[in-house]
């Protein structure tokens, strides 16, 4: 006969309840996305609000790592798109006299001191439905879109954008003017993923499902897309497409802007970011100095 102490039984019951609730939400979202009603009911709006709350606290996310592989949670993207479909344009007031207009299902995210997020005054904004961990610093102006996930210790510098569903790891430095592209559709398309301890230089752009693995350095002015060839000068070869039909920047890689001659006309050059080296003590010291300056 199986016997469990009361506290173990309660823990198992709570875990089962959470799992069941998560599966129920997923099924309801998929059903609602595939069979859009003619009118949105109070029950539909309650489901979306519960979904949004789960996004806000990081309980669910649009993409997550399982057994070392990044997996897109398509149903989460479906839920976000439901919010756009369901919402009606409304007026929001910002400050004393500033008005802006957006869907009534997707207001600006609100923060409190208890969130332990440093938000320097001057015009930053985050859309409801993004997750921002404690210990994150946001310099003005910056924008974080719905579905984005930003882990602890990360710095979002001035004029930076974290797009919809983009995933940003721990202790990442997004320098001024860095753009981390977002994606909602196609549903199955992987968002941009910036793993832990990555340094992204100023005026960079990373788009179209690129993965930047841990401790990589993306130099200022580098633009990386799924259609831009990337050359590894250390291994003397071009990066190949990964399973997400995009590129994965290897861990510790240092990537700088570059170019190569066009095949059709070698008198002209096209963009080609170059991995010039992999991180060493000199690179680490430069990154550590940047981290010290922001504390």
Placement of each model-derived feature along the sequence:
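Intrinsically disordered, low-complexity regions enriched in polar/acidic and amide residues
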Residues: 6-7, 25
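Cationic, low-complexity basic patches in intrinsically disordered or flexible, solvent-exposed regions
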Residues: 2, 8, 19
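Terminal amphipathic alpha-helical/low-complexity segments used for targeting or macromolecular assembly
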Residues: 21-117, 246-247, 251-253, 257-295
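Structural signal for interior beta-strand "rungs" in well-ordered beta-sheet cores
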Residues: 113, 118-263
């Amino acid at each position: 006969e199986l016997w469990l102490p009361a506290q173990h039984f309660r823990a198992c019951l709570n875990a089962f309840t959470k799992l069941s609730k998560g599966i129920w939400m997923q099924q309801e979202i998929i059903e609602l996305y595939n069979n859009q009603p003619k009118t949105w009911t109070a029950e539909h709006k309650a489901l979306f609000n519960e979904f949004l709350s789960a996004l806000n606290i990081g309980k669910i996310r649009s993409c997550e790592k399982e057994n070392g592989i990044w997996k897109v949670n398509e149903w989460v993207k479906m839920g976000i798109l439901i919010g756009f479909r369901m919402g009606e344009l409304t007026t929001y007031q910002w400050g004393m006299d500033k008005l802006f207009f957006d869907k009534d299902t997707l207001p600006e995210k609100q923060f409190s001191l208890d969130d332990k997020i440093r938000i320097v005054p001057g015009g930053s904004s985050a859309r409801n439905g993004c997750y921002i961990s404690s210990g994150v610093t946001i310099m003005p102006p910056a924008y974080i879109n719905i579905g984005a996930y930003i882990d602890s210790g990360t710095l979002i510098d001035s004029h930076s954008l974290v797009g919809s569903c983009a995933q940003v790891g721990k202790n990442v430095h997004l320098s001024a003017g860095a753009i981390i592209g977002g994606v909602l559709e196609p549903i199955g398309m992987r968002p941009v993923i910036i793993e832990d301890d990555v340094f992204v230089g100023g005026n960079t752009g990373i788009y179209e499902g690129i993965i930047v693995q841990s401790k990589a350095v993306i130099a200022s002015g580098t633009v990386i897309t799924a259609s831009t060839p990337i050359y590894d000068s250390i291994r003397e070869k071009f990066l190949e497409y990964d399973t997400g039909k995009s590129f994965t920047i290897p861990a510790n890689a240092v990537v700088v802007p570059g170019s190569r001659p066009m095949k059709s006309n070698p008198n002209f050059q096209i963009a080609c970011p170059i991995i010039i080296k992999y991180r060493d003590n000199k690179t680490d010291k430069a990154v550590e100095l940047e981290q010290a300056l922001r504390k």
